[in-house]
């Protein structure tokens, strides 16, 4: 997948026109304006917040999941996003097994780093024991989805 393609290139002309009209009609609301703004960005330009929001809002969900997985793999740690790491893992765990399974090799590496290499104990992010357990729970959900 080309991470440099603008997100609007993944929309039909009609869908993109709808995004524009929504942003114009509801210009006082942040969500339609944000949606229009991200359509003019490529995946690699999206912030971690944008990726989390894409999954939460069910827009470009598969592309956002792909980008999160790519970033985790490139950085060789699921904690690259600092304070957003837990929320990103939570959102990633909500993705369908079909989408996650397409990235099985990279997710297996991530899971191994969390489970076997104890990356969670060496993360730059300070987590309480409860937060670590929650994080591991999200990892287990992903693990079960890609079996």
Question: Which residue ranges define each predicted feature?
Answer:
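Long, low-complexity, highly charged intrinsically disordered regions
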Residues: 1-48
């Amino acid at each position: 997948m080309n991470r440099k393609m603008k997100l609007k290139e993944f929309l039909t002309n009609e869908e993109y026109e709808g995004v524009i009209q929504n942003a114009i009609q509801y210009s006082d609301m942040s969500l339609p304006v944000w949606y229009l703004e991200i359509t003019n960005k490529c995946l690699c330009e999206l912030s971690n917040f944008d990726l989390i929001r894409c999954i939460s809002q069910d827009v470009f969900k598969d592309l956002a999941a792909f980008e999160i997985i790519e970033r985790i793999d490139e950085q060789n740690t699921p904690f690259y996003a600092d304070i957003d790491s837990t929320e990103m893992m939570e959102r990633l765990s909500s993705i369908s097994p079909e989408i996650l399974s397409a990235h099985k090799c990279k997710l297996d590496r991530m899971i191994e780093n969390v489970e076997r290499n104890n990356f969670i104990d060496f993360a730059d992010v300070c987590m309480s024991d409860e937060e670590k357990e929650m994080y591991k729970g999200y990892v287990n959900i992903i693990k079960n989805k890609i079996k």
